[in-house]
Design a protein with these regions (language model features):
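Short, well-structured beta-strand/strand-turn elements
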Residues: 6-18
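Catalytic-loop signature of eukaryotic-like protein kinases
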Residues: 17, 141-153
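Hydrophobic or amphipathic alpha-helical targeting/insertion segments
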Residues: 18-19, 23-27
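ATP-dependent phospho-/nucleotidyl transfer catalytic cores
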Residues: 34-136
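Active-site substrate-binding loop specific to GH73 endo-beta-N-acetylglucosaminidase modules
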Residues: 48-51, 56-60, 150-152, 161-168
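C-terminal catalytic region of ATP-dependent kinase domains
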Residues: 119, 140-141, 153-200
């Protein structure tokens, strides 16, 4: 995939013809965010987080989306011992903080979040999140920007987060419309400038 070629963590994704109640359609299946996903993407096992949908649904309707937070997805890694628990709790706290800062500044930040920058976890040259945001928008995969659809890997070696591609809806039948309208959608020029400012 394009994102995999750009060295982003991506799950195995494939289309399957299924029949539900006699209606045949093509459905998209993605690999679960587990140890095998990290190994296949040449990452050491560590905490995987995802957007927490449990607090944003009320009476069957989406609400409180700006208050969305995260949760640990690979709980077995947490249970490995004191060191993995300490790493997970520190990373979880940092990611929750980034979600709260973004929630309080949603008008300015829109769908953008960089937990490394918001927590000063990486040096200013770490452009992982700006580049990921740019690539997702270029692919018309904005569905993956929804905060309860996001996934994150915490790299224990450099103490920083990495985005994990998930549910971008790139294969959607309305994707062509998204690509045609992407030019008219606002995009923070600073994100592009920060990510690709050295491409003069």
């Amino acid at each position: 995939s394009v994102l995999n070629a750009l060295d982003f963590i991506t799950p195995e994704t494939f289309q399957v013809v299924v029949s539900v109640n006699g209606i045949e359609s093509v459905m998209l299946f993605q690999e679960a965010a587990r140890k095998e996903l990290l190994e296949r993407n040449y990452k050491r096992e560590g905490p995987l987080f995802e957007g927490d949908e449990s607090i944003i649904w009320g009476n069957g309707r989406l609400k409180n989306d700006d208050e969305s937070l995260s949760r640990l997805e690979n709980k077995n890694w947490f249970l490995k011992g004191a060191s993995s628990q300490e790493i997970t709790l520190r990373a979880f706290s940092d990611l929750q903080y980034a979600y709260m800062v973004r929630g309080n500044n949603s008008a300015e930040m829109g769908q953008y979040i960089d937990p490394n920058a918001l927590n000063n976890l990486a040096n200013s040259q770490n452009l992982t999140f700006p580049q990921f945001h740019f690539a997702m928008q270029a692919l018309g995969a904005e569905h993956g920007f929804v905060f309860h659809n996001r996934k994150y890997y915490f790299n224990v070696f450099d103490s920083s987060f990495e985005p994990v591609y998930y549910d971008g809806n790139v294969f959607s039948s309305i994707n062509n419309l998204r690509l045609r309208t992407a030019i008219s959608q606002p995009f923070a020029r600073d994100i592009i400038r920060n990510a690709y400012g050295n491409l003069d």
